């Protein structure tokens, strides 16, 4: 949804980064954004290539404490969490700061619960980045969003990949948690 919002607000180019094939395909099909699979590419190098060496003007981190990666950074964060030295895995926000162009903006929309380690404050300062974080308090946007949905500018039906009864709730949560059967969102009906 952040990618679609960026496009509606006039972003010239939108690149979505993920590792799950079903989400990458959904993004390409329903949003029209370019996609990168971080498990098979050097995201920073790829973003520099796509932007003529500068990096993106704006980076949106939308996964928060649930971010994943491969390699030592992920292992480091997992160990710190097990030792209760940090609460979250700030991999995506770190990468957003490192990828963003000088003078750019980084927005953190993902949920974080507490402390993080290895936050690249030096890069944030030296690049002169603007960092904003927000939990969505969007009641004031509901009328505008409903108008855009009515005009067909925003569609959401593709997000509900698994519709099931409330009785199947535990199964739906398992599908979502374990990323099984292409589950992006389980929606429960009474």
What residue spans do the PLM features occupy?
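Glycine-rich phosphate-binding loop and adjacent beta-alpha segment
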Residues: 63-151, 158, 190
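A glycine-rich helix->loop->beta "capping" turn
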Residues: 50-58
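C-terminal hydrophobic helical "lid"/dimerization subdomain
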Residues: 53-54, 94, 138-190
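Mid-domain Rossmann-like dinucleotide-binding core that forms the NAD(H)/NADP(H) cofactor-binding site
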Residues: 1-41, 45, 60
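Short conserved loop adjoining the S-adenosyl-L-methionine
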Residues: 43-49, 69
């Amino acid at each position: 949804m952040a990618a679609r919002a960026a496009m509606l607000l006039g972003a010239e180019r939108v690149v979505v980064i993920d590792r799950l094939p079903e989400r990458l395909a959904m993004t390409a099909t329903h949003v029209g954004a370019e996609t990168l699979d971080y498990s098979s590419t050097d995201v920073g190098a790829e973003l520099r290539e796509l932007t003529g060496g500068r990096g993106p003007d704006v980076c949106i981190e939308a996964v928060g404490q649930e971010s994943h990666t491969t390699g030592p950074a992920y292992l480091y964060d997992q160990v710190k969490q097990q030792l209760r030295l940090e609460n979250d895995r700030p991999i995506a926000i770190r990468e957003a700061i490192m990828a963003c162009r000088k003078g750019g903006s980084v927005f953190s929309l993902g949920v974080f619960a507490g402390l993080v380690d290895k936050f690249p404050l030096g890069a944030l300062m030296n690049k002169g980045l603007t960092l904003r974080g927000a939990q969505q308090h969007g009641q004031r946007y509901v009328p505008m969003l409903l108008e855009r949905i009515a005009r067909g500018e925003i569609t959401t039906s593709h997000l509900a990949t698994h519709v099931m009864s409330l009785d199947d709730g535990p199964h739906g949560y398992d599908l979502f948690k374990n990323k099984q059967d292409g589950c992006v969102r389980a929606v429960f009906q009474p």
